[in-house]
Every structure is written in C-alpha cells, then in structure tokens.
C-alpha cells in the first residue's frame, strides 16, 4: 500500500469508527440507572424494541469498551477515560447479576431484564437460565480485557474461573449453545473457533496477573488452533461448519456447508494466535482457507458474501435425502443461506486486508477492494441521524427485518474490525 492510499485509508476508517458507528452507541447504549447496555434495536437502528439484556451482547460491549480504553489512536485521553467508565458499568452489572454459582462449575445467565433479574428464553422455559456457553465466553473475554484495561485483578480471577469452567464443560460435552442449539452427536466449528479466542484473551490477562497460568493458556491456545484446523478443514482449504462429535464428516448438506464469514473471522483469529505463539507455519493454510471461502461465498449476481454456502460448489446449499431437517441449524441454513450480513463483510474486510498486506498477496488485496466497494455501498445507513450499518440484507441487498441469532443490533463485529483495521494500518505507517 503506497503512502497516499495508506493515509486515505486511515482517514476513512477513523471517520467510519468515530463519526458513524460509535456515536450511535455512545448516545444510546448505556443504562444509566441499572448499569450495563441496551442493544435490542431494530435492524435499521430506528427504535429500541426491548430493554432486555442478553449476556452474550453485554460481554461483547465490555470487551469493546475495555479494548478502546487501551487504544492510543485514534482516541483522546478523555475518550479513553470515558470508555473505561462505560466498561466498568458493564463489568459491575455482569458481576452483580449474571453468574450462577452452585455445586456445578461457574456459569452465566443467558438473558436478563434491564435490572439484571434472570429471564428464561421463550420456548425453553423449563430448562433454566444457563442456555449458552457462547454467552459465558463473551463474558469471559470482556472480563479478561477489562482486567488489563483497569488493572483489576478481581476481574481477572473471575475470568480465569469462568475460562476453566468453559474448558471443562467443553471437554465433558456438558454445555448448551443457544441461539444455535444442536443435537449431541454433532459438534459445530463455532465453539472450536471461540476456544482460540478464549485462550488468547485469558493468556493476555494472565501475563499481567498470573504468569504461571499463562503457560497453561499458551498450551491451550496452540492446542485449540491445531484442533480447529485438523478437525474442520480439508486439503482443499474448505472449512465445514458441522462434524460428528467424535470427528468425521457428516453426510448431506448438514455436514457439507460452510459459513464464509466464520472462515474469514477464524483465519485472522489463527493469525493473531500464531503471532503470539511465534509460529508462522499456520499462515499458508490460513490463506488457502480464506481464498476458498471467498471463492465459494461470493454472489456473482448481486455481489457480497452469502451467509451459508455448499462446501463443494459454492452458492445455494441443496437439501439431501437424509438431512436432519429438525435441527435448528439446518432450518436456519436452508432459510437464510443467501442473506447478506453486516458481520460477514466486516470480518472479510479485516481478513483480506491483513493477510493481503502481510503476505503481499495480490489476489487477497483484490478481494479486499471488491469487498470494500460492496460493503460501503450497501451496509451504511443512509439515514444520517443513525449512520450505524443496516445489518441484515436479502440476497438482492434490500434491507429485511428478521432475526439471525439474537433479537439485537450488535455493535461487536463492525467496531472490533474497524479497530483492528486501524491498528494494522497504523503499523504500516511506521
């Protein structure tokens, strides 16, 4: 990237983060009465439709504000101080309200009302409050990052306890995965992916507070990367979403579909981990998987990346004779495969830029330009009073009101990727 393009890119992304995305959330998300954050907005951001609080999103907010509080650029000292205050609001709300402490390992409530009182999920009223190990993981990540930002060892100790609980439950298959429930004979790529993130975050925090535990987290980080790449990818670079619990490919489209956004996200997870591990050997396989996901996932008619695709030929996943049609993931796959989602394109932007520049890979840099043009044509909200992205589009890029995971408008992927894009671009200035 030449100097002029670099400076233009930095200016563009600073504007997108600081003048378009963050103002929406800074004006709307804080619950000044109870603590924590609101984010149950409509897809276009025009209305707050519920004051419920999903622990999944509360933990993500905590991570974002904690991370931004540590960024020297593009924020001022006053802004970083405000981010840390907002992070503390979420941290205190979660620590006060979200944990389930009994004779089992530490777990988190999945859903709370605005005061922090636990709520059951519609359709799962008799199944308790701890409905998703993913939600536990986002709380863990938020507390890990907050412990670093605020130099708060108590938050680290809670994050460590939660990390050990998550890993134990994963290894004993004792967990649930709302909003992506799946039968016990299957395992989803998503949790193996998130294990990398959990191990990465607790490693960073333990380096500050607990060097002995950092050695354990370092080992788990490498193990998580190897398991993910060995179990879910093939020699052609295809990364499938679902396998059998004991390993092995699931027949039919249920085992033969991919999520291009997950692959983009996963590959930069692995690269970040590889940097920390000091092991560049993962890069070649990551690039192969990334290129394959982009090839399979791109819509040649309307542009953009599909939500789900056939892992062999790309495009529409076609049903087979023996597909598990009652699996919720299968239903989501078949009904929403062609959706164009905000988070998919933000992940693709960062992944293609990062790998393209670091590997000097023209094909990936061309993909970055293509994804950039598409993303900033269709996702930014044309209503300048809102500006935050329209998050869910139909195949033809028209907005649609629907729920893809939780009934929330989530700032996490856009904000995190804009932060990471800027952080990377700043390194190119040096």
Residue ranges of model-derived segments:
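Glycan-recognition and catalytic cores of secretory/periplasmic carbohydrate-active enzymes
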Residues: 1-430
């Amino acid at each position: 990237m030449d100097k002029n393009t670099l400076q233009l890119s930095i200016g563009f992304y600073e504007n997108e983060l600081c003048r378009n995305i963050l103002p929406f959330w800074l004006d709307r998300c804080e619950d000044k009465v109870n603590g924590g954050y609101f984010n149950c907005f409509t897809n276009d951001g025009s209305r707050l439709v519920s004051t419920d609080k999903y622990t999944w999103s509360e933990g993500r907010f905590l991570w974002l504000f904690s991370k931004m509080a540590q960024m020297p650029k593009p924020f001022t000292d006053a802004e970083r101080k405000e981010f840390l205050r907002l992070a503390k609001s979420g941290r205190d709300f979660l620590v006060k309200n979200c944990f389930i402490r009994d004779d089992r390992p530490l777990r988190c409530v999945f859903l709370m009302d605005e005061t922090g009182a636990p709520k059951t999920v519609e359709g799962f009223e008799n199944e308790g409050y701890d409905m998703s190990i993913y939600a536990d993981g986002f709380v863990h990540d938020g507390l890990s990052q907050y412990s670093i930002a605020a130099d708060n060892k108590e938050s680290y100790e809670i994050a460590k306890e939660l990390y050990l609980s998550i890993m134990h439950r994963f290894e004993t298959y004792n967990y649930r995965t709302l909003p992506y429930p799946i039968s016990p004979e299957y395992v989803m790529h998503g949790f193996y992916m998130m294990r990398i993130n959990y191990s990465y975050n607790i490693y960073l925090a333990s380096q500050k507070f607990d060097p002995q535990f950092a050695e354990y987290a370092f080992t788990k980080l490498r193990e998580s990367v190897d398991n993910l790449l060995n179990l879910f990818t093939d020699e052609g670079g295809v990364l499938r979403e679902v396998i059998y619990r004991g390993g092995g490919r699931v027949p039919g489209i249920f085992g033969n579909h991919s999520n291009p956004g997950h692959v983009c996200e996963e590959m930069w997870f692995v690269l970040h981990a590889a940097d920390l591990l000091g092991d560049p050997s993962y890069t070649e396989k990551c690039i192969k998987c990334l290129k394959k996901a982009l090839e399979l996932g791109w819509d040649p008619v309307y542009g953009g990346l599909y939500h789900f695709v056939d892992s062999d030929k790309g495009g529409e996943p076609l049903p087979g004779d023996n597909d598990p049609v009652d699996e919720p993931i299968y239903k989501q796959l078949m009904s929403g495969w062609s959706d164009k989602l905000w988070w998919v394109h933000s992940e693709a932007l960062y992944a293609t830029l990062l790998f393209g520049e670091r590997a000097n890979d023209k094909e990936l840099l061309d993909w970055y330009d293509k994804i950039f043009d598409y993303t900033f044509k269709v996702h930014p909200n044309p209503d300048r009073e809102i500006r935050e992205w329209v998050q869910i589009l139909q195949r033809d890029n028209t907005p649609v009101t629907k729920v893809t995971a939780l009934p929330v408008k989530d700032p996490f992927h856009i904000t995190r990727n804009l932060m990471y894009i800027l952080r990377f671009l700043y390194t190119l200035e040096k």
